[in-house]
Amino acid sequence: MINQKLLVSGADYFTDDYKINPYYTEIKINREKAIAEHARIVECFREAGIEIIKVDPPKGCQDGVYTANWAIVKDGIAVMARLPEARKGEEAYARKKLEEQGIKTYLVPENYLYSGQGDSLRCGKYLFAGRGYRSDPEAQTFVADKLGLELVQVHANPQLNADGSIHINPATNHADSFWYDLDLAISIIDEHTIAYCPGALDEESNKKLEAIQDLDKIIVDYDECTKGFACNLVSTGKHVIMSANAPKLKSALEARGLICITPEITELLKGGGYIRCISLWLS
């Protein structure tokens, strides 16, 4: 079983003051609704038998609701994130909260970007690692070495401007993608199964995934991935808390005997985050 204990915060400071990814639009966020959605997701986690560690969100941090970006945790060890400048206020707070749980923390070297669990998905012996947007490849190598995992680095397709050039996000000054974090393109179903969207990843990355023979793979529909946040789910290996707008993936999971729970979400996704994004896997 996976995702048996999760750390969550809250949407108390969730706003759209700075548009840190392509999902922030001109449509205003309803914070009260976002808080209710967050509470419903946490309720779904508990329905699935998951233990929840609830901490206050860091004050004044609009993206502090997305705890998945705070670190990656394995066997009582956490490698802390190096977030974009707009989220730097979360870093020390996140480390403090994990250390309060008795978790030993390590820091990625200072000159590298690293997006925590958002860009590092562990499945059995593998670490599926995003690079090129919110995480540097050197940071992912550091993480894999520290956690003793076999590194599989992949790269999502970029967001393009009308002229075909790669879009640079003005809030981060980095290249942007609709799959800026890997947990929008790949999900871990159990220790032997992943679900992923080939259309979200470049050709080399697809070849890497296809070459892995000791994992079962579920292909995720491109529209469900991009419009329904299909991959941004939390699975225990028995229950899956997932998008209500991904019927094909839901059917594929139910055909494998998994129980799917599908809360309705409209506000949290406006910040580019969904079910996986608001939860950090502790054990």
Where are the regions a protein language model picked out?
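The feature marks the mature, well-folded catalytic cores of soluble enzymes
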Residues: M1-S283
